[in-house]
């Protein structure tokens, strides 16, 4: 993981993955600048339900079911509609459905680990998923990455893409994670933590987490591909 010109020396993979040459600026095409306009028409029925969108009929993935929900806002607190949100995550055991995941943890055949949703007219979004597991990484010996979900947000055009991660309130691994702790502002780190929301608990089985996303301003969510303060 690299935030433009920032490399996290404690997370060695960020050094090997970071570009070593100056970026090339390419003029954007008119289609990139003017579209697309997202609407619910591009969504499939269960795109925001990760407990169903990859599972076999009559089966469900393993793990604690959760709701992750919130609002996408601008710096003035205005809710933003028609924002395409895509998420991806590890399964309950901490395994990604990706060919480059070196973990020996078994894949959950009923969990794909990705979903998408378009914010409603009041900027609201919601996903039903499985609480992801933490997983070890070899950059600094026996350390683990805390539970997290990756978020990608598209605005009214493909050039407006922002990427971030949501962590889980109370996870003891957060304090030792070099990625979130590379953010110097402790208040900015707090904005990346999804808060337990018991009002969203359903049928005494599904836990709720609230994660609002602010795109600009002093209280903006920290994005991996956007400079601080921009």
Q: Which residues make up each language-model segment?
A:
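Beta-strand-dominated extracellular/periplasmic modules and repeats
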Residues: 4-230
């Amino acid at each position: 993981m690299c935030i433009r010109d920032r490399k996290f020396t404690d997370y060695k993979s960020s050094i090997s993955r970071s570009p070593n040459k100056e970026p090339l600026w390419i003029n954007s095409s008119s289609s990139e600048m003017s579209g697309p306009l997202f609407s619910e028409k591009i969504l499939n029925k269960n795109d925001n339900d990760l407990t169903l969108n990859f599972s076999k009929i009559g089966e469900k993935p393993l793990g604690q079911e959760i709701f992750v929900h919130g609002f996408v806002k601008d710096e003035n607190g205005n809710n933003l509609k028609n924002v395409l949100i895509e998420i991806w995550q590890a399964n309950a055991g901490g395994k990604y459905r990706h060919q480059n995941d070196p973990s020996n943890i078994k894949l959950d055949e009923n969990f794909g680990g990705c979903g998408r949703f378009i914010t409603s007219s009041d900027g609201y979004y919601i996903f039903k998923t499985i609480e992801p597991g933490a997983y070890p990484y070899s950059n600094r010996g026996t350390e683990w990455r805390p539970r997290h979900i990756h978020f990608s947000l598209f605005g009214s055009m493909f050039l407006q893409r922002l990427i971030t991660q949501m962590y889980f309130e109370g996870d003891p691994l957060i304090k030792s994670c070099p990625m979130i702790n590379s953010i110097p502002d402790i208040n900015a780190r707090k904005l990346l933590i999804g808060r337990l929301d018991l009002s969203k608990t359903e049928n005494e089985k599904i836990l709720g987490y609230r994660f609002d996303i602010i795109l600009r301003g002093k209280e903006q969510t920290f994005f991996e591909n956007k400079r601080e303060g921009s």
